[in-house]
Amino acid sequence: VILNGGRAVHYPCRAQDGFLPDPDAVEALITPRTRALVVINPNNPTGAVYPRELLARLAAIAARHRLVLMSDEIYDGILYDEAPFEPIAALAQDTVCLSFGGLSKVHRACGWRVGWMSLSGAVERAADYLHGLVLLAALRLCSNVPGQWAIVPALTGPDTISALTRPGGLCLVETQVVP
C-alpha cells in the first residue's frame, strides 16, 4: 500500500467483540480513495474465526463500494474448538477477490516463502490489476524452487497441525493459559 502511495486504514477487532470487526465500523472508514478491503481470517494473533454472516456482510460492503477484497487465509488450518472456516471468496461473487495462502503456518514451513494467491469473483474487472501482478512477478519475484517441490507432499501428506489444535492439544492448552 505504502509503496504505491496509499495509506492503510485499520479497523478495530476488540476483545469485547470476540476480536471480530464491526461491519458498520468498517464501512464507515471507507472513502472515495479506498481501493481494497483486507480480511485476515482466521485472525492472527487472536485466533478468531469469522462467522459466515460476518464474511457475507464484509463481502457485500466490498461489492457495494467496488473494492478489491483481499483475504489472508494463511491460518485456515489452525482452528481451535473445531471452529468452522469458510473462505470469503465463496461469498464474494460480485467483487474481485484475492485469497492468499501458503505452507508457512499450517505446514510449519516458516521462512520458505512458499505461498499462493487465487483470484475469483468479478475477474472481468481485474484486467489492469492482473497485468500489474504479472509485471511485478516478472520483475521482482524469485521462485523458491525447492519449496515449490514441497507443496504437493505438504498438502497431501499427513495432518500434523490438528494434534496441536484439537481439545487437549498443546497449542489449545497454551492459548487457554493466556489471560
Regions found by a protein language model. Give the residues of each.
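Aromatic "clamp/platform" in nucleotide-sugar-dependent glycosyltransferases that forms part
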Residues: 42
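Conserved core segment of the aminotransferase class I/II
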Residues: 90-157, 162-166
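Acidic-residue sensor for enzyme active/binding pockets
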Residues: 73, 148, 174
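Active-site pre-lysine segment of PLP-dependent enzymes
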Residues: 2, 9-11, 19-33, 45-68, ...
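PLP-dependent aminotransferase-like
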Residues: 1-39, 49-52, 152-179
